[in-house]
Amino acid sequence: MTDTTQDFNTQLIDELLKERKRDRRMGLVKSGLVTLVAVAYLGFAAMMTGLPFMAEAPAGDFAAVVKVSGEIGAGKEASYANLAPLLKKAFETSNAKGVVLLINSPGGTPVQASLIHDYIVELKTKHQKPVIAVGEDMLTSGAYLIAVAADTIVANRSTVAGSIGVISAGFGFTGLMEKLGIERRVATAGESKNLLDPFGPRTETDVVRQKALLEAIHAHFKDTVTQDRGERLNLETAGLFEGAVWTGDQAVAVGVIDELGNLQGAVKKHFGVDETVVLAPQKPMFSALLKGFSLSVSDALVQTLAPRGPQALYYTER
């Protein structure tokens, strides 16, 4: 090999190494830019999540609509954390002549329903703005507790309404564990710490304590409904506070709701306006898609099988 050829090969190798280094640097720059954009987007999305969003609010008077949909509970769409900023925005908007609670829910946890109810009453008192609740398919249990915060409750004649009661449900696996040869090992400090363990036998003491807990929460529910509905309730109605449900037309007769109607008719009648604007939480892009993958199979199984706390919830399937 001549010196000239060797020099050429050396230069060629040097150039190739330099080009590879440039490519590596460009790759790092591109990766950094992509990461920066992703972090900026996620930060903005996190900032925007939960902020009230009012779509195309008209210049004139309108009714502000806040939807209560699905099961009520912490971490769900119908939670105090999600609905509180929407309710605040609805009451504070000057040309919103009234607030509508558009409800389609079987209920949920007593605490979340009570928090939402109490906040509506607080805002209504502070801003002196009328509130109506409009029930769609379901207006039961915890959802009904929220509805009684309104001045007027409206529903369709086929709406299912009522279910003033509390339920706690779960499963027992003692027989299955015995068949599978599985031994339950648990240690507690405090005799009530393992109350209603699904992997152990249910005792009479457990049943008595759970019943006392449910009855206390039920009493809170009844007190709120009685106070808010007042003389409109027919207290002689059989099953009124025992979890009974009625269709919309039946519910009017017993004072559970006030009148039959729909959203548009109700806002025209009670607020004297035609326009309605729905307030919704501002969600980041792809949040709905990501939500579907947020629970692992094991998490979902545990949530399904584990005993549930008290629920102000109406079950349509038994």
Language-model regions, residue ranges each:
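N-terminal organellar transit peptides
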Residues: 1-132, 137-139, 145-156, 168-318
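Active-site loop architecture of trypsin-fold serine endopeptidases
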Residues: 158-166
